Amino acid sequence: MTTGVGAVVAAPSAIPWDRLGWTLLGTAASAASASMFNQLLERRRDALMQRTAARPLPQRRVGPLPVFALACALAYAGWALLVWKAGWIPAALATGNVLVYALLYTPLKPLTSLNTLVGAVCGAVPPMVGWTAMTGSLDAGAWVVGGILFVWQLPHFMALAWLYREDYGRGGFVMLPARDPSGNLTAQTMLLTSLTLVPMALLATLQGLAGIVFALCATLLGLWLSWESLRFLRARTDAMARRVFLVSIVYLPLLLLVMVLDRGPVSPAAGVRLRGVVDGGDVAGPPRSNAEPRMPSGQTAPASAP
């Protein structure tokens, strides 16, 4: 979903649906690979947790070797599809994300609560894959859409980790809520990051990615999530944490839907303009990096040699 939003917001007025479809397929393959590597490495810990004990690996319904082989095949397929149909930058982002998720985020989970920040980085990459598939560059717009996803994951996951703090403890995972019995630090983190979502989302309007309607909706949604986080800070109960979690689930699809519906011309400050006029002409089609060179006004390109 987030890859598609990043691509649509960055796309020309005439969305290249074939490029979008291949980008979604390649990103899905990469994401599935990362998830499989994660479950392979955590299969023994997953068996100790009520939430994950029924997964195929802990239940031994499938062996580690075929899972490893399929994960490798999906990682390669995702990389190949994205290189072929989207470009080197989205392919590098997606494949790098698989490596970070499997080789950094997963091993950090039993060691430090900072693993959540690394996981949030991984969650921020898919919309950047979509963006770069359409633009061919990691310009400011890519960082804005990625930044929104990064910040959103923090209150979302803190609420989830609070609800399953005992389960995470049984699995030996070092999550902040599992090491914060009072919940005070967890609640403060949720409130701070929820409030940060308001200016973070407004950057999309300032960069020309979306319009005033989006800015208004983003502000209201951010304040709603912040209010629920404040309620959790005042009464640190599972019921309040569940409300934050549910509101965060509502927040993201609504925000992304409004961003797509109210997408605006990308600001020149973002480094590329995708839905308006570039150097005096309309843009439609592949990224500028793959486009034929523009001729100055009044001139025509020389005829090709026979």
Model-inferred region functions:
Residues 1, 8-43, 80, 88, ...:
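Membrane-embedded alpha-helical segments that form the functional core of polytopic membrane enzymes
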Residues 29-36, 99-107, 147-165, 198, ...:
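Transmembrane alpha-helical segments that form the membrane-embedded catalytic/substrate-channel core
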Residues 31-58, 155, 165:
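Acidic (Asp/Glu-rich) catalytic motifs at the cytosolic membrane interface
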Residues 43, 50-91, 181-205:
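Multi-pass membrane catalytic core of lipid/isoprenoid biosynthesis enzymes
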Residues 64-134:
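Intramembrane alpha-helical segments
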Residues 128-138, 197-204, 251-268:
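Hydrophobic alpha-helical transmembrane segments in multi-pass integral membrane proteins
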Residues 182-185, 226-254:
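Interfacial loop-to-transmembrane junctions
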Residues 257-281, 303:
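Juxtamembrane boundary at the C-terminal end of a transmembrane helix
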